[in-house]
Amino acid sequence: MTRLLVVYFLISALLVGLDQWSKYLTVQNISLGETKEFIPGFLSLTHLRNTGAAWSLLEGKMIFFYVITVIVSVVIIYLLIKNYKKSIWYSVGLSFVLAGAIGNFIDRVRLGYVVDMLQTDFMNFPIFNVADSTLVVGVICIFIYLILDEKAAKEGKNGTN
């Protein structure tokens, strides 16, 4: 395994650690259902238990989430190992998506639900967590890679962004 590939897996591990640490702090310091102002007018912390996905979709379907998460994680690890030199955008994106999937998977296996805590005060949006955020950032990075790769292909380059 090359150093670069180790860096991408280290990124995932650090993000999983940050996610689990934030959930631990939430459970230890905020009662279930309680809200604490964090950044006034912007972000509050609300301790919730989510047995589904975003917006509580597929609530209670834990076996489904276990199977999908394992499959997705294996595919991402395979793609990262095979393509880690392809693009920093692509590889960082995969690392972030992997971290998000694993972070929420740990909660589901250990607790039977996912701990959510981040609540936007400036707009009505479902309460989420660090793992959810890393998933979104990862997908954005992969989209940037796809856009840059398509642009490079149109310009006749080899498409390595």
From Swiss-Prot:
It is a multi-pass membrane protein. The gene is lspA. The chain crosses the membrane at residues 4-24, 61-81, 87-107, 127-147. It is an enzyme of class 3 (hydrolase). One of its GO terms (cellular component) is plasma membrane. GO terms for molecular function: aspartic-type endopeptidase activity. The active site is at D116, D132. It catalyses: Release of signal peptides from bacterial membrane prolipoproteins. Hydrolyzes -Xaa-Yaa-Zaa-|-(S,diacylglyceryl)Cys-, in which Xaa is hydrophobic (preferably Leu), and Yaa (Ala or Ser) and Zaa (Gly or Ala) have small, neutral side chains. This protein specifically catalyzes the removal of signal peptides from prolipoproteins. Its EC number is 3.4.23.36. This is Lipoprotein signal peptidase. The lineage of its organism: Bacteria, Bacillati, Bacillota, Bacilli, Lactobacillales. Keywords: Aspartyl protease, Cell membrane, Hydrolase, Membrane, Protease, Transmembrane, Transmembrane helix. Belongs to the peptidase A8 family.
